[in-house]
């Protein structure tokens, strides 16, 4: 009788331990799943790729291959990679660099935007750009919200008030071979500080994302009318190498201000 009681007690304790083990495994799995975007949430993120002469082989690599994408092609060279997640390939005239492409996408898709739009240049094969773009996607996935990887300044307009450029050459080798021009078409209003004042009325912002790599929440885009973006793109429609593109690079936070749905993370 005593042996039977001991046996029953052992079975009971073993059952409790087994239950606790299975509960912990189940809890860990669910916590892990909640920390990352599920497939449905990944479909709410779209990559907008501004391509000129790059091969875009990276588009099939992890983590880029997790997300739907649209490619805007600005050259006659159509020899580049797409992926099963590519929803469209759009040909555009070669004006305005990537900045024009980004505004064009917003204008054309104003009523059909993804919850999070991630803007990438085609040159993510370059190590510095690849590292930043991969981190951006990882931060979006981990934080489950839009993220802006950036450098922080006390006041962007004041920091870059006198900034202007007379020459600039594409940093990607394939792009510079196809288009070796380095003379910039000067902005009608310059330097940056005056241009910024004209566009954004001296709005104070503190964050800048370089390399044309950043993302925006749909709500932040739609809080401004389509005409807001239609007016801004005019500065980028007449030249393949506009100085204004470098001004926009420093002013994207003003374009979408306030970015209240976004987590700012300094690089």
Predicted regions and their residues:
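Juxtamembrane low-complexity tails/linkers enriched in Ser/Thr-Pro and polybasic
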Residues: 1-3
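ER/Golgi luminal nucleotide-sugar-dependent glycosyltransferases, focusing on the catalytic module
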Residues: 5-267
């Amino acid at each position: 009788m005593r042996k039977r009681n001991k046996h029953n007690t052992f079975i009971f304790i073993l059952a409790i331990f087994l239950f606790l083990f299975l509960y912990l495994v189940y809890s860990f799995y669910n916590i892990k799943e909640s920390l990352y975007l599920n497939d449905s949430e990944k479909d709410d993120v779209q990559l907008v790729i501004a391509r000129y002469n790059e091969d875009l082989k990276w588009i099939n690599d992890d983590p880029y291959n997790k997300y739907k994408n649209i490619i805007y092609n600005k050259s006659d060279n159509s020899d580049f990679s797409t992926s099963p997640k590519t929803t469209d390939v759009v040909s555009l005239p070669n004006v305005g660099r990537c900045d024009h492409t980004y505004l064009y996408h917003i204008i054309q898709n104003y009523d059909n935007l993804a919850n999070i739009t991630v803007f990438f240049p085609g040159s993510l094969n370059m190590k510095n750009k690849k590292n930043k773009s991969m981190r951006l996607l990882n931060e979006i996935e981990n934080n489950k919200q839009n993220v802006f990887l950036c450098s922080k300044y006390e006041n962007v307009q004041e920091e870059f008030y006198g900034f202007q450029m007379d020459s600039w050459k594409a940093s990607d080798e394939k792009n510079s071979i196809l288009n070796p021009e380095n003379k910039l078409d000067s902005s009608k209003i310059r330097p940056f500080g005056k241009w910024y004042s004209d566009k954004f009325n001296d709005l104070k912002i503190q964050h800048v994302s370089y390399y044309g790599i950043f993302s925006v929440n749909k709500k932040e885009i739609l809080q401004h009318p389509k005409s807001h973006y239609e007016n801004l793109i005019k500065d980028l429609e007449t030249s393949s190498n506009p100085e204004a593109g470098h001004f926009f690079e420093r002013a994207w936070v003003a374009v979408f201000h306030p970015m209240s749905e976004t987590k700012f993370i300094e690089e």
